[in-house]
């Protein structure tokens, strides 16, 4: 059985905006991962990186409630990394 590891990589508060990221290093073929903004912040934009040539992004978009960024990817059944990041700003 494959263990899925998801973690927040970093969160830095820099002059009114925050960068957040999540990483999945599992061996799952079909993955959905979200980078979630801190409370009282909304997502301004987001993105991703993948580490395998055969992995494909099928979805990259903000969450409907504005609380983060979601990416869906499909890749091989061996280890590859999906990283999702988001830029969050003060909710005003």
What are these regions (language model features)?
Residues 1-92:
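Extracellular attachment/recognition segments
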């Amino acid at each position: 059985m494959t263990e899925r590891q998801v973690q927040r990589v970093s969160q830095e508060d820099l002059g009114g905006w925050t960068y957040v990221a999540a990483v999945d290093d599992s061996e799952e073929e079909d993955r959905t991962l979200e980078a979630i903004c801190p409370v009282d912040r909304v997502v301004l934009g987001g993105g991703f990186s993948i580490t395998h040539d055969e992995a494909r992004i099928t979805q990259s978009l903000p969450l409907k409630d504005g609380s983060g960024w979601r990416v869906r990817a499909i890749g091989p059944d061996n280890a590859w990394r999906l990283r999702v990041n988001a830029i969050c700003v003060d909710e005003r």
